[in-house]
Amino acid sequence: MDIVNDLVSSISSISSEAAEEEAIRDELRNDKGGLIAGIFVLTLTASFVPWFLTKAKITNLVSVVSILTCLSAGVIIGAGFNHILPDAAEEFQSYVEAVAPDNKYGDFPFAHTITIVTMFALICVDKILVSGGLDGEADHNHMDLSQHNHPSPHAAGEIDLNIYTNGDDDDDDVNEDQEEDSTKDDEKEHGHGHGHGHGHNSSNSSSNGHGHGLKKKKKSKKEHGHGHNHDHSSNGHSHKDEKDSEKVNVSSKSKAWVFLVALSLHSIFDGLGLGSETQKDSFYGLLIAVLAHKFLDGLVLGIAIKYAYFSFKFSCIALVFAAAMTPLGIGIGMAISSAYESSTDAYLVKGIILSITCGSFIYISLIELLPSGLCQKGWPKLKLAVAFLGYSVMAILALWV
């Protein structure tokens, strides 16, 4: 009789555990469905922020984005090493125990190896894309916003992304005033103004005779000599300026393309990890990391696309495409997880997907986000502090999530 009771109790326990796991899967399935729409809207909205702020006079956008970028990098590093990588290693361990518990290679760090291989693969793809020549440049930084610090002069009223050049015009005005005062002093000292002969000008370039001199920089307000000093710079350099402007525009378009491809690839890996995750705590830990940088991803991509001066129609198509990549990855991950749900191969599949996701996290945080945030001028100590803060928060959350 006791044996029968124990058997019934065991069956009931197994049934209750199965029912609980099924309830968790249903809950996560519903959350993932809502997440598909939520992440798409979040990323797309962030991508169009530069257009929303076109008429606003914002002078510190680069500094704000760079600080948030460092914070996001810290969060992603913490999520990768404290959440995703341990879960991936656990999945591989479960697979080995279920299939070949006595295998002598069971303790091999499969998760860590796949993670590092993925990181190097992404670096190789990145460098091959650029060095192969979309614009023929040897080096770049996808998220370096300094290239967008000087928007087109035709875009009047648009955002000034460089807070470190605001004082340049004032300095030029001061220099002009100083040059004008110096010119007046010279006039008084030498006792002649607009006569023939050897004259003086405030830009340290002398003109003989009638003073037909060429100037590389802008003319001083007052000049000595005969007064016939001609400035040929506007005509002589107009074609060169047009070529330089065209070259910069092509470079901006190429970098925007590269960033679009790289970000889309990384977004698919984000979605794969979220879609394949079946553990509630691990899912929400990964979700925090993904949401921490999705807004920034969209914002920086929007800046890159906007200041590459594509047509608005093409920009919309590109941004919608990029925003759809994480939801696409979630859907693929859910399909893979469902296909292997009742098989021991599910451990292997989830372990591989999580390891790839972790590798992409390390790449995007240490290769792209953190260097990009630190390369912008200003607040280096604050940026390092917020990066460590982001990591610390995710490390502490690993105690419960």
Curated annotation (Swiss-Prot):
Presence of keyword Iron: no
GO cellular component terms given for this protein: plasma membrane
Compositionally biased intervals (Low complexity): 200-209
Annotated keywords: Ion transport, Membrane, Metal-binding, Transmembrane, Transmembrane helix, Transport
Localization per Swiss-Prot or TrEMBL: Membrane
Biased segments, Acidic residues type: 167-184
Transmembrane segments: 33-53, 61-81, 114-134, 256-276, 285-305, 316-336, 351-371, 381-401
Membrane topology field: Multi-pass membrane protein
UniProt xrefs under InterPro entries: ZIP
GO biological process: zinc ion transmembrane transport
Pfam families: Zip (PF02535)
Chain segments carrying region Disordered: 141-247
GO molecular function: metal ion binding; zinc ion transmembrane transporter activity
Keyword Heme: no
Family in the record: Belongs to the ZIP transporter (TC 2.A.5) family.
Task performed by this protein: May transport divalent cations. May participate, with dstA, in the regulation of the differentiation of stalk cells during development.
Protein name: Protein zntC
